[in-house]
A protein has these predicted regions:
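Short helix/turn-capping signatures at newly exposed starts of structured segments
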Residues: 1-125
Length: 125
């Protein structure tokens, strides 16, 4: 992950601040999605030494968020807090804390107790 610049490479496609839905249409990930709903990328994607389920969120035609849910370990639904801990450990590997602000946006580990889900989020301004 390229936290200082906000760039992230997924299966040979680079995502970055100011990335647009028009840019996304030129990638192998594009399969006629509308850019309004959440766009899940098919299958687990390897980034550095971890595998993630990746979702993209666009707002007003620009990339708003990349959501990474690490699937290195199988976590039962009722134990999702273990995945949340793993996400914090991954950020720690990069020298990051749970919430990190940069000129381009934010990287943070999110755990939502209502939906019992966790993710590493790249939030672009």
């Amino acid at each position: 992950m390229y936290q200082k610049t906000g760039k992230i490479m997924i299966d040979g496609v680079e995502f970055y601040p100011d990335y647009t839905f028009e840019d996304f249409k030129k990638t192998p990930f594009y399969t006629n999605q509308d850019g309004i709903r959440i766009i899940p990328l098919n299958g687990a994607k390897e980034i550095d030494d971890h595998k993630y389920i990746v979702n993209l969120f666009f707002r007003d035609g620009k990339l708003y968020m990349i959501s990474l849910a690490c699937v290195d370990m199988d976590v039962p639904f009722e134990e999702e807090e273990k995945r949340a801990l793993l996400h914090r450990q991954i950020l720690d590997e990069y020298g990051l804390s749970d919430v990190n602000t940069f000129p381009w946006g934010t990287i943070k580990a999110i755990y939502d107790s209502r939906s019992n889900s966790s993710t590493i989020a790249f939030l672009y301004q």
